[in-house]
Amino acid sequence: MATFLVVLRRSGPQWDPSRPIEEQSDWPAHASFMDGLVDAGFVVLGGPLADEHRVVLAVEADSEDAVRATLMRDPWSETHLRVDTIDPWTIRLDGRHASPRAARGMESAPFG
């Protein structure tokens, strides 16, 4: 059964800290691979943290092993971004879908 997992990836040995993520070597191949994972429904959310040396992914997969096997196919898997941690994630709040409040016309936040 598919479950949500949070993946933290950290910069690898070929990461150039003087360059932004989009200017790292072999960026087009990595970006294309990751876009494919989004299209396949594997990656739900993802992106770099502010330091751009770490990336967080929320994925939907059957197991940690499946996540590792999938990410090993990334052209950056050992050179630019290595898997640091993979943790199961229980989603309690999900704003990706219309909330019952929005459906009832109560779109403003109760605290803002």
Enumerate the predicted regions with their spans.
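Conserved, structured core segments of small domains
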Residues: 1-112
